[in-house]
């Protein structure tokens, strides 16, 4: 149930043949074949290109930052202790 049997496929093929005609179907199949051929050529061209990693970028010395030296905690003054 729900599947296409042989008689259904034959009727479907006849309807498609009537709608598009024999010439149009063969033209579409030729275009389909050309598309597959160009796709395969494109895939082969992509595979034949050597893959080179991009050169590593070394940051300039002026952009490298060193952490600031640690500053000692401020010493409490005599006015801070009086309160």
From Swiss-Prot:
UniProt region (Disordered), positions on chain: 34-83
A Pfam family per the record: TatA_B_E
Membrane topology type: Single-pass membrane protein
Stretches of the chain forming a coiled coil according to its record: none
Membrane-crossing segments per the record: 1-21
Family matches, as InterPro entries: TatA/B/E (IPR003369), TatA/E (IPR006312)
Function: Part of the twin-arginine translocation (Tat) system that transports large folded proteins containing a characteristic twin-arginine motif in their signal peptide across membranes. TatA could form the protein-conducting channel of the Tat system.
Family: Belongs to the TatA/E family.
Subunit note: The Tat system comprises two distinct complexes: a TatABC complex, containing multiple copies of TatA, TatB and TatC subunits, and a separate TatA complex, containing only TatA subunits. Substrates initially bind to the TatABC complex, which probably triggers association of the separate TatA complex to form the active translocon.
Protein name (Swiss-Prot/TrEMBL): Sec-independent protein translocase protein TatA
Organism, as annotated: Novosphingobium aromaticivorans (strain ATCC 700278 / DSM 12444 / CCUG 56034 / CIP 105152 / NBRC 16084 / F199)
């Amino acid at each position: 149930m729900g599947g296409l049997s042989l008689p259904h496929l034959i009727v479907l093929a006849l309807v498609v043949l009537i709608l598009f005609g024999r010439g149009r179907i063969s033209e579409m199949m030729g275009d389909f074949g050309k598309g597959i051929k160009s796709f395969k050529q494109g895939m082969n061209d992509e595979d034949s290109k050597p893959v080179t990693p991009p050169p590593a970028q070394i940051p300039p010395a002026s952009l490298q930052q060193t952490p600031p030296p640690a500053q000692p905690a401020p010493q409490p003054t005599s006015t801070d202790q009086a309160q």
